[in-house]
A protein has these predicted regions:
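Short amphipathic alpha-helix that is part of the acyltransferase structural core
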Residues: 141-173
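Conserved beta-strand in the GNAT
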Residues: 21-25, 196, 202-212
Length: 315
């Protein structure tokens, strides 16, 4: 659950958690001043700012006057992160507030792959457990991503992979043993790892996160060293609506951009006949780059850019 629950009311924005309206002063420069409402629950301030920026998309920044907020530990922590008492939307959403643990960091060394003749940064170790958690006020659900576990996820994953809708695009139906072995292989790969997406801690989707340079897509475009890519499927029928797709697609892109601050672009390469997915990609910040052929499918390459995502798309 959210620590704030900011909603629209007849008199402006209201916090259900505090059971009072927010004292917001609206400026002429697409900014606002949020006056301190008093004693706050743990985690309230960041949740409130996140939801204010969504409830009032015209806002470019929210000021938290230091003289009012200087006794509030949550505000002081935030001031230290942004080096100001003015919280800009684009900078705020790039803080690692929604990472479940600090992102892994690589050594900084470079690696040469002689077989593929590519030279790229050494990648960090695969993360463990949950990697991202954020309350999405648009759908009033908690979105989270965690590393897939062959022990607890194999039966569910097998059911998803044998769904005709999924099998049509993934071409990977098979027994429980086959799917368990597949998940285990994904957990030992050097350039990719598997995630399970959850709404309110209920699994609904499967994603594979990879470094584009080392993936098959790297042969088909001019990659940058920290480009990230993803494969995806939604396994549970109840979570297939457009509003849910926008939630997890933006959330997953957000995670990739937070996990590695040097990542400027995220890419996908869905089959060209996956028309339903393409309808959702542009609103989430993805634009078509080109179409090309893999040995097993014709694909469309789509890409999201960090600057465009945080300035024009958002969460």
């Amino acid at each position: 659950m959210s620590e704030a629950n900011i909603i629209h009311s007849r008199y402006g924005l209201r916090c259900e958690k505090l059971d009072k309206p927010l004292n917001l002063g609206w400026g002429l420069d697409n900014s606002a001043v949020l006056h301190c409402p008093g004693e706050l629950p743990t985690g309230w301030l960041c949740d409130a700012l996140d939801q204010i920026f969504i409830a009032a998309p015209q806002l470019s920044a929210v000021a938290l006057p230091w003289a009012e907020w200087r006794e509030e530990p949550q505000a002081l922590t935030l001031f230290g992160q942004v080096k100001s008492d003015i919280i800009h939307r684009t900078a705020f959403w790039q803080l690692p507030l929604w990472l479940s643990s600090p992102a892994n960091r690589a050594s900084g060394e470079m690696v040469f792959d002689a077989e593929r003749e590519i030279y790229f940064p050494q990648r960090p170790p695969r993360p463990l457990g949950e990697v991202y958690r954020r309350y999405d006020p648009r759908i009033r659900r908690m979105l989270s991503f965690r590393i897939a576990d062959p022990v607890s996820d194999a039966e569910r994953f097998t059911r998803w992979m044998n769904d005709p809708r999924v099998e049509y695009f993934w071409e990977q139906s098979g027994s429980l043993e086959v799917q368990t072995a597949y998940l285990e292989r994904q957990l030992t790969g050097k350039h990719a790892f598997p995630l399970i997406g959850c709404f309110d801690d209920r699994p609904f989707s499967y994603f594979e996160i990879y470094w584009a340079a080392e993936d098959r897509i790297g042969r088909h475009y001019s990659w940058q060293p920290f480009d990230r890519g993803l494969h995806l499927l939604v396994g549970e029928q109840q979570w297939r609506g457009a509003h849910y797709v926008q939630s997890w697609l933006r959330g997953l892109t957000h995670y990739l951009l937070l996990d590695e601050p040097r990542t400027q672009r995220t890419v996908l390469e869905p089959r060209t006949d996956n028309l339903r997915l393409f309808r959702h990609l542009e609103p989430a910040g993805y634009r078509t780059i080109k179409e090309f052929d893999f040995p097993h499918k014709r694909s469309r390459m789509v890409m999201a850019d960090r600057h465009h995502f945080f300035t024009e798309v958002g969460l």
